[in-house]
């Protein structure tokens, strides 16, 4: 017994000694844990790198940096002091809304000094930049490595054969480089390997499958983007190879087009739990063999655009399936049938991604999935009422039904108590948001935009975790009070735009939230400026346009948050000092103060601003201050003010300018030459000023689409560079100037030209015969698009874009008007009020897409356009006050869209062709043509109307003939009924028997309904905008 006591005492003392030595070694005095030899090796390694972001600032040989075990990214064995871990990986940083992400990478080359670290078992150098060099062979000598990650680090070349020496490796990640795989025999030596990624490598080895299956312990394999569609394993390889341990398989982006190219997956093992095949080119039916993978939990088939037939019935065998993603696969299937085929996973399924497909039907039966957490169904063709499908779903956290055709009232949302995000935008829901919304205590994002909802409940104010609320573009009405907003302490994005709401709060109300996005256009916030904005310190977007504010800017309003990006106060009646408002911050991207009562001199253009709108105000004086601008906006609109004086000649500094609108001011003098240096310019409006002199050259502005210089006093001839250099021009308006000379035929090279207005000048000579080269005018469709500028980036957490739509002053159907976005619907040529001579070229008749042609008030002779009947889209034709002669062509009657016609004051003769269309015009359309006759003018002398044709056939009794014509025989009716039943049941029978025909038929019906709905929405939206502008 005493022996055991002494033995235990000795063991205790020994352990205590070890602990004392370890503590002393690690913490005592000035003694360092780091070994000198390994410190020197690490410093040599550092010298081979370029550290632009100070990742290795803690590394050094200074006295206070001697302990290398405390350097960033270094770990040591606490007992021996040997370096065991080097972790210098970087992470991508993606700023909100950025199209690309950034990583603060190390650059340079790897030093073989790492070989001195003989106990190194963990090396992570991922997401760095090693100059597209080959992976150093010496890494294959770090034999104790268990973890090696060189992914996304700009390596290239072949994988060193020396990797076969890394027999202790459990994780090897070489993905996202530019490696070439010619030999994989080294893999068979890595008997402990559990994770392997060779993603984005260029496979040039035919026996890759055979070699990979020689790694018996492999659990996860990533071969994404390796071009495996061209390297299908042979049947012999499939028969003799397997990977029983494999659980997770990544095969994204391999250009697989059919299941035969990845059928080897089903030979590997039946134990797979996760497969991703997203971003391939799969087509046809989904392989039934997925249903044999009884352990499958995760299946991703997203972004394969040609999958047909939907979910196969074999998926009912996947009783462990937790995650299924078939988004953006163009799947056409009846949704209730799809849910039925997933019934085997009704207890396990947690995430179901079906967005961006062609699913139809209602979402009934969605409640059968008792574990469902996330359901993505946006951008389909779902219809029916939400109420039909509502049932208690206590687990659902994310539901997206946006951009469908669902209708009716919303259900009691308290049925979804776990919801964190609810997206119902762009449907046809009606009624009020249910009172039960207030019970969703975990709700963070609520989007009900673009529906027909009418009211907001006060229970909204109970959503203390709500971060984003978007109810824009509904028909909400009534008053929002403090009760609606009382507890929304987490709210950062509020969008109630384009409703009929009034926001009424007490004068000293302090909101419980700090918003990043405030979007309240068309909400009634006035007449006074909303004082609660003074409490908001973090917003990046402030849009209170159309808000019925008629007040002077308060002094506190100029103290903006430093990150403000969008400021929109347009369409109010606000007055005050603009200079204080926009000169106190450098973060602006968009400033829109248009349609207000601001006055005074032009303020300096703020630094970094991209869109700057001051139009429809009362600014006055010179704009020479623009030369002091330190920024180059993308879009600048100063139109409809009282600016005067000469235009400054400093535009060469605004190199980014794409839209410049200086119309409707009092500018005088010549157009400065520096405007011609704006190589990014797409639209230039300077109409209705008093500019004089000749046109400067815009030949460098080769992207110019709109050139509107009408209503000035410009002189000289039309320059040839318009036709040779401005080949993208779509609108050319030089109307109401003092130009002379002939119309140069070189402008016929403008194949994209849609609107040509040279009216009211002094142009002479003949009309060129090449107008049929205007390709867009030759096409009989509307191909116009608005000019659109998107401000890059997210503001708050959510994307925003800003749209610029230009206008044009044109003579359309005998009325001079301004048209917003004329490129969408106008195709016109106006050469009126000049001194043109000669005949009208017959080539004009080839312009079948032309909608308005005005050649009036010239000295043209000859006949009305030969072949004019081809111009079937023509709505307005004015050839009055010329010297045209001859008869009116008969095919003029073919122009069924023609609503304005004026051929008066010519020398036309003969009878006006007979048609309901031509006789419906007023007499003034044909007046002052001395020899023209026929309705609606006086009848032609001696004209006798043609007699009705009478059938003198065998039946000599007209009454009997009429009866025979009027009453078909009984046999006719019987055959008609039989034909209807045969056709009806024949088509219906095919739809019942053939599911693919049935799906295609219903998809056609749904597509047609969607198209009609979309068209009606577009026209309704345009009508709303016109009505708002009219107000």
UniProtKB/Swiss-Prot annotation:
A Pfam family annotated for this UniProt entry: LRRNT_2
Side of membrane Cytoplasmic, spans: 993-1031
UniProt record, GO biological process: defense response to fungus
Domain of life: Eukaryota
TM helices/strands, residue ranges: 972-992
Coarse class of the protein's main subcellular location: membrane
One Gene Ontology cellular component annotation held by this UniProt entry: plasma membrane
Region annotation N-cap: where it falls in the sequence: 30-113
Assembly and interaction partners: Interacts with EIX elicitor protein.
Purpose: Involved in plant defense. Confers resistance to the fungal pathogen T.viride through recognition of the EIX elicitor protein.
Full protein name: Receptor-like protein EIX1
Source species of the chain: Solanum lycopersicum
Phylogenetic placement of the source organism: Eukaryota, Viridiplantae, Streptophyta, Embryophyta, Tracheophyta
Gene: EIX1
């Amino acid at each position: 017994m005493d022996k055991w006591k002494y033995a235990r005492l000795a063991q205790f003392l020994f352990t205590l000694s070890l602990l004392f030595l370890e503590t002393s070694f690690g913490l005592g005095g000035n003694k360092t844990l780091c070994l000198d030899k390994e410190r020197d090796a690490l410093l040599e390694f550092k010298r081979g790198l370029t550290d632009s972001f100070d990742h290795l600032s803690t590394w050094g040989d200074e006295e206070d940096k001697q302990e290398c075990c405390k350097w960033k990214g270094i770990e040591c064995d606490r007992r021996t002091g040997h370096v065991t871990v080097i972790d210098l990986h970087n992470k991508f940083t993606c700023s909100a809304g950025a199209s690309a992400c950034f990583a603060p990478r190390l650059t340079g080359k790897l030093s073989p000094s790492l070989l001195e670290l003989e106990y190194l078992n963990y090396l992570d150098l991922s997401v760095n930049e090693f100059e597209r060099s080959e992976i150093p062979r010496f890494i294959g000598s770090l034999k104790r490595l268990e973890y090696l990650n060189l992914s996304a680090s700009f390596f290239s070349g072949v994988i060193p054969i020396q990797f076969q020496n890394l027999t202790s490796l459990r994780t090897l990640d070489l993905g996202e480089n530019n490696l070439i795989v010619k030999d994989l025999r080294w893999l068979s030596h890595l008997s402990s390997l559990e994770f392997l990624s060779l993603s984005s490598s260029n496979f040039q080895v035919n026996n890759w499958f055979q070699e990979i299956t020689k790694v018996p312990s492999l659990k996860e394999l990533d071969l994404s983007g390796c071009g495996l569609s061209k390297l299908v394993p042979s049947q012999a390889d499939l028969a003799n190879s397997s990977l029983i341990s494999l659980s997770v398989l990544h095969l994204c982006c391999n250009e697989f087009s059919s299941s035969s190219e990845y059928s080897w997956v089903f030979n590997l093992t039946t134990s797979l739990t996760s497969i991703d095949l997203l971003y391939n080119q799969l087509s046809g039916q989904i392989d039934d063999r997925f249903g044999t993978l009884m352990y499958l939990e995760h299946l991703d088939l997203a972004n394969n655009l040609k999958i047909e037939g939907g979910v196969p019935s074999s998926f009912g065998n996947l009783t462990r399936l937790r995650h299924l993603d078939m988004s953006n696969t163009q799947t056409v299937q009846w949704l209730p049938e799809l849910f039925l085929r997933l019934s085997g996973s009704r207890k396990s399924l947690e995430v179901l991604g079906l967005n961006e497909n062609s699913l139809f039907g209602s979402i009934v039966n969605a409640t059968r999935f008792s574990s469902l957490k996330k359901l993505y169904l946006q951008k389909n063709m779902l219809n029916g009422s939400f109420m039909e499908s509502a049932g208690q779903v206590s687990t659902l956290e994310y539901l997206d039904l946006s951009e469908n055709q669902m209708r009716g009232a919303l259900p009691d949302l308290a049925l979804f108590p776990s919801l964190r995000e609810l997206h119902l935008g762009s449907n046809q829901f009606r009624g009020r948001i249910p009172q039960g919304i207030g019970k969703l205590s975990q709700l963070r994002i609520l989007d009900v935009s673009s529906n027909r909802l009418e009211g907001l409940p006060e229970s909204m104010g109970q959503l203390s975790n709500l971060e984003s609320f978007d109810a824009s573009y509904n028909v909400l009405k009534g008053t929002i009070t403090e009760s609606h907003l009382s507890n929304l302490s987490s709210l950062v994005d509020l969008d109630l735009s384009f409703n009929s709401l009034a926001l009424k709060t007490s004068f000293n109300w302090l909101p419980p939230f700090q918003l990043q996005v405030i979007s309240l256009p068309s909400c009634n916030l006035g007449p006074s400026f909303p004082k609660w904005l003074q409490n908001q310190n973090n917003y990046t977007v402030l849009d209170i346009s159309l808000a019925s504010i008629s007040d002077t800017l308060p002094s506190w309003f100029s103290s903006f948050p430093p990150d403000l990006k969008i400021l929109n106060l347009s369409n109010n009646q606000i007055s005050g000092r603009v200079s204080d408002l926009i000169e106190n911050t450098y973060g602006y991207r968009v400033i829109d103060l248009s349609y207000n009562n601001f006055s005074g001199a032009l303020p300096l253009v703020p630094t970094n601003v991209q869109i700057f709108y001051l139009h429809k105000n009362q600014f006055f004086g010179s704009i020479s201050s623009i030369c002091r601008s330190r920024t180059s906006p993308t879009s600048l609109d100063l139109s409809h003010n009282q600016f005067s004086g000469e235009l400054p000649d400093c535009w060469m500094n605004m190199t980014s300018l794409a839209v410049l609108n200086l119309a409707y001011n009092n500018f005088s003098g010549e157009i400065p030459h520096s405007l011609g240096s704006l190589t990014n310019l797409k639209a230039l409006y300077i109409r209705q000023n008093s500019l004089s002199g000749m046109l400067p050259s815009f030949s460098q502005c080769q992207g110019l689409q709109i050139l509107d210089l009408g209503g000035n006093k410009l002189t000289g001839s039309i320059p040839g560079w318009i036709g040779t250099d401005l080949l993208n021009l779509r609108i050319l308006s030089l109307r109401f100037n003092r130009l002379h000379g002939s119309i140069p035929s070189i402008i016929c090279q403008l194949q994209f030209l849609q609107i040509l207005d040279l009216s009211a000048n002094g142009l002479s000579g003949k009309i060129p015969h090449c107008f049929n080269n205007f390709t867009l005018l030759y096409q009989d469709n509307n191909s116009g698009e608005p000019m659109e500028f998107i401000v890059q980036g997210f503001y708050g957490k959510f994307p925003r874009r800003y749209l610029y739509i230009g206008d044009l002053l044109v003579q359309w159907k005998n009325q001079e008007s301004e048209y917003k976005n004329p490129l969408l619907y106008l195709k016109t040529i106006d050469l009126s009020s000049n001194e043109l001579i000669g005949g009208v070229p017959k080539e004009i008749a080839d312009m079948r897409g032309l909608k308005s042609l005005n050649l009036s008030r010239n000295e043209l002779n000859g006949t009305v356009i030969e072949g004019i009947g081809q111009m079937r889209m023509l709505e307005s034709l004015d050839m009055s006050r010329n010297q045209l002669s001859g008869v009116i062509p008969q095919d003029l009657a073919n122009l069924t869209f023609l609503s304005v016609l004026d051929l008066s004051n010519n020398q036309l003769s003969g009878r006006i062709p007979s048609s309901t269309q031509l006789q419906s015009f007023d007499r003034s359309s044909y007046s002052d043509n001395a020899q023209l006759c026929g309705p609606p003018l006086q009848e032609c002398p001696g004209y006798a109307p043609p007699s009705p044709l009478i059938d003198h056939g065998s039946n000599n009794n007209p009454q009997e003939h009429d009866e025979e014509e009027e009453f078909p025989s009984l046999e006719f009716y019987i055959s008609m009924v039989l034909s209807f039943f045969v056709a009806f049941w024949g088509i219906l029978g095919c739809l019942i028997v053939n599911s693919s025909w049935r799906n295609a038929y219903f998809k056609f019906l749904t597509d047609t309904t969607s198209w009609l709905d979309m068209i009606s929405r577009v026209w309704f939206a345009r009508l709303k905008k016109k009505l708002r502008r009219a107000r």
